[in-house]
């Protein structure tokens, strides 16, 4: 037992169990002041944001009474997001449409960019580019934004009375209700991250093992599941906001 204890202590001292150092793949960092910034995520996120803003500006810069193809597409997307928000939040959905829409569009375009844009062709000093949602930092940030949003929604409508939900229907459930607020962002972030990472890894492995034509059906399936993941994230975010405003589980 003494030998085993000493061995474990030695391993820990050598840093072999530093969980914070565990990474999926190699990463490229920028050192800005005293902060280490994950450059890959910033670069790809800026590209996705530029695609969204550029597409919106080009499509609706000159609105027509009879919509053009681009304007018609964006109006369809807006109606879809409004329907999702209204279904999950209720009649007070209006102020939350921009937030839900931003989540859905950013995640959707991020997911598709991983399959459609040739990120791998861009050489970096270290690591390689990939979809923003292929990185846990992005998905955790989106999940935390959702948590802040539903706390704000509940507090803005009910004030401090919002916290009474933690002891309903009985105070015995207080620990479980508190734990639920931690599991929501965890489930949102890891579900999205895991699905997108797994999809890209499957495609990479298939391309390396078999001719390029064979993985194409898997790539199309990946595009479909990427869209579904964006819809799931946005729908759950809207549902959590609606739940916090209504005060029921």
Curated annotation (Swiss-Prot):
GO terms for molecular function: proton-transporting ATP synthase activity, rotational mechanism. Signal peptide: none annotated. Keywords: ATP synthesis, CF(0), Chloroplast, Hydrogen ion transport, Ion transport, Membrane, Plastid, Thylakoid, Transmembrane, Transmembrane helix, Transport. One of its GO terms (cellular component) is proton-transporting ATP synthase complex. It holds the Pfam family ATP-synt_A. SUPFAM superfamilies: F1F0 ATP synthase subunit A. It is found in: Plastid, Chloroplast thylakoid membrane. The chain crosses the membrane at residues 40-60, 97-117, 136-156, 201-221, 222-242. Key component of the proton channel; it plays a direct role in the translocation of protons across the membrane. HAMAP family: ATP_synth_a_bact. PANTHER family: ATP SYNTHASE SUBUNIT A, CHLOROPLASTIC (PTHR42823:SF3). F-type ATPases have 2 components, CF(1) - the catalytic core - and CF(0) - the membrane proton channel. CF(1) has five subunits: alpha(3), beta(3), gamma(1), delta(1), epsilon(1). CF(0) has four main subunits: a, b, b' and c. This is ATP synthase subunit a, chloroplastic.
């Amino acid at each position: 037992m003494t030998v085993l204890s000493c061995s474990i202590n030695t391993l820990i001292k050598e840093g072999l169990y530093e969980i914070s150092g565990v990474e999926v793949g190699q990463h490229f960092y920028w050192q800005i002041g005293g902060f280490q910034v994950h450059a890959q995520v910033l670069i790809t996120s800026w590209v996705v944001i530029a695609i969204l803003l550029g597409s919106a500006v080009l499509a609706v810069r000159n609105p027509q009474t009879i919509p053009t193809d681009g304007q018609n597409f964006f109006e369809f997307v807006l109606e879809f997001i409004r329907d999702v928000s209204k279904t999950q939040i209720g009649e007070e959905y209006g102020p939350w449409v921009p937030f839900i829409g931003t989540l859905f569009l950013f995640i959707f375009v991020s997911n598709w960019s991983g399959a459609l844009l040739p990120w791998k062709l861009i050489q970096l000093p270290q690591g390689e580019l990939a979809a923003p949602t292929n990185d846990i930092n992005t998905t955790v940030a989106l999940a935390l934004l959702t948590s802040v949003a539903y706390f704000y929604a509940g507090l803005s409508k009910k004030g401090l009375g919002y916290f009474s939900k933690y002891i309903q229907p009985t105070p015995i459930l207080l620990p479980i209700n508190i734990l639920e607020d931690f599991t929501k962002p965890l489930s949102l972030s890891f579900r999205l991250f895991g699905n997108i990472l797994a999809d890209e890894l499957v495609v990479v492995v298939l391309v390396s093992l078999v001719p390029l034509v064979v993985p194409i059906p898997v790539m199309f399936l990946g595009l479909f599941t990427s869209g579904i993941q964006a819809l799931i994230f946005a729908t759950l975010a809207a549902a959590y906001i609606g739940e916090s405003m209504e005060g029921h589980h």
